[in-house]
Swiss-Prot record:
Function summary: Catalyzes the N-acylation of UDP-3-O-acylglucosamine using 3-hydroxyacyl-ACP as the acyl donor. Is involved in the biosynthesis of lipid A, a phosphorylated glycolipid that anchors the lipopolysaccharide to the outer membrane of the cell.
Family: Belongs to the transferase hexapeptide repeat family. LpxD subfamily.
Active-site residues, Swiss-Prot/TrEMBL: 248
PROSITE patterns: HEXAPEP_TRANSFERASES
GO annotation (BP), single: lipid A biosynthetic process
InterPro entries xref list: Hexapep, LpxD, Trimer_LpxA-like_sf, UDP_GlcNAc_AcTrfase_non-rep
Protein name: UDP-3-O-acylglucosamine N-acyltransferase
A Gene Ontology cellular-component term: carboxysome
Disulfide bonds: none
One GO MF term attached to the UniProt entry: structural constituent of carboxysome shell
Gene (name only): lpxD
């Protein structure tokens, strides 16, 4: 595909993007690649900042650049075709779709699938080998159920939702349209509910529900647990990485992003557009406000106000954490200074 053809397809997708002003640079593009790995015939992108120097190092034939005249001049000097946009990474995400389409098998039901006679199947769905679908399940149009998926009784799955191989959807689960559940994930598994008694722990049955709203994505080997009563809910367009635990009764709002190994204890409430980086832990019943960002390995034992950026364990404002970290590095030097001052006081 010629670069100008790619530019024409991409330019309407991001506001205020502009085509290259060098019509003579119209290389053939056969693939996309990371900027430090790209070779002749490949398209990549640069967001600026610390990556700006990669313009001089890359072997890419074309780049998606920010609105930075210096970067554009460097690319032109190296005979690299370019298109500019305020959001290079977003435009590159669109570009990937021109060269790669995820595997989506043709509609049909594999003969080894076990499907109860009461199941309601939508149009043009795919059900792979050794899938098990129990009684009372409803599956929407154009859904894709890959090999070895198990769907428990009464589950509802929306249109165009994809269940990847070996995931499990337990009873009392409702999954919306355009969701993606990756391999090994468990949706609607029993919440961790036990009541102490003189004879040990009495199991509290988990009779509640799990709801994944439209556009939710759940990563490999993650779990969203159902509660004893009530509902565990994951809001619209929220994206959850691999190895994440969402406990019973959690309420997660729309457009959140959780990275790997995040753990939410029971009853946590998460506002809109919250970002939790890797290994963030949130304590029982904590409320996290809209727009909060928690850096990696933050421990959140209490409520966090909307818009806060927090770090460390227990969580503190990120600016305070950075100041404290800078001081921490100087503690040995400060300790020696303190010892000298103390000695002078004792001698005076």
């Amino acid at each position: 595909m010629k670069f100008n053809e790619i530019s024409e397809k991409l330019s309407p997708l991001v506001t205020n993007s502009s085509l290259t002003t060098h019509p003579d640079l119209n290389p053939d593009i056969t693939a996309v690649a990371a900027v430090d790995e790209a070779v002749t015939g490949q398209l990549s992108y640069i967001e600026g900042g610390k990556f700006a120097a990669m313009v001089q190092k890359t072997a890419a034939s074309a780049l998606i650049l920010p609105r930075d005249e210096a970067l554009q001049a460097q690319a032109t000097e190296k005979d690299i075709a370019w298109i500019t946009t305020p959001e290079p990474r977003l435009l590159f995400a669109h570009a990937i779709k021109l060269f790669y389409q995820p595997f989506h098998p043709s509609p049909g039901i594999h003969p080894t699938a076990v499907i109860d006679s009461s199941v309601k199947l939508g149009k043009d769905i795919y059900i792979g080998p050794h899938v098990v679908i129990e009684q009372g399940v409803t599956i929407g149009d154009n859904a894709c159920i890959h090999a070895n998926v198990v769907i428990y009784p009464g589950v509802s799955i929306g249109d165009r939702t994809i269940l990847h191989a070996n995931c499990t959807i337990h009873e009392r689960s409702q999954i919306g349209d355009n969701c993606v559940i990756h391999s090994g994930a468990a949706i609607g598994s029993e919440g961790f509910g036990f009541v102490p008694t003189p004879d040990g722990w009495f199991k509290m049955e988990q009779s509640g529900y799990v709801v994944l709203e439209d556009g939710v994505e759940i990563g490999c080997n993650s779990a969203v647990d159902r509660p004893a009563v009530g509902t565990t809910r994951v809001g619209r367009n929220t994206k959850i990485d691999n190895l994440v635990q969402v406990a019973h009764n959690c309420q997660i709002s729309e457009n959140c992003v959780f990275a790997s190994q995040v753990g939410l204890a029971g009853g946590v409430k998460v506002g809109k557009r919250v970002i939790l980086a890797g290994q963030v832990g949130v304590a029982n019943q904590a409320n996290i406000g809209d727009g909060v960002i928690a850096s990696a390995q933050t421990g959140i034992p209490h409520d966090i106000a909307p818009g806060e950026i927090v770090s460390s364990s227990p969580a503190v404002p990120n600016k305070l954490y950075l100041k404290a970290s800078a001081i921490y590095k100087r503690l040995p030097e400060m300790y020696q200074t303190l010892k000298r001052l103390q000695k002078k006081l004792e001698e005076s």
